[in-house]
């Protein structure tokens, strides 16, 4: 547990933190990042591992080059978050009563049809807007009038948005 602000980094190992109530930066070159509770501003970066986040009520930016991201959010006012993976999947779990605006983007190849791209973003919520062009397939979701912004981006993976 980290009661204030902190920085944790490792060259190749895993990082597991119980709870962070302040701001923190977590980074590893090749391991996984596990965080079970945060209310501050968090940055989590790994080059080759997975990122697992639970009970996150603060802002978070999570980036992985070669892993998956699993995030369970409890969004509060102005707790904007961004999740990016180059070649992994993103799973977001969020309460159906959350006030949040979600933008899910999958980068697609020129030869992919819209119906094929549609299979890459699955959600328990109804999309408010869908945009498909030669590079991107984007679904936007506005829950309960919108609020904090959540961005989900993957270059070659799938995105799932589930009710918690």
Feature map (PLM): residue ranges:
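Intrinsically disordered, low-complexity terminal regions
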Residues: 1-164
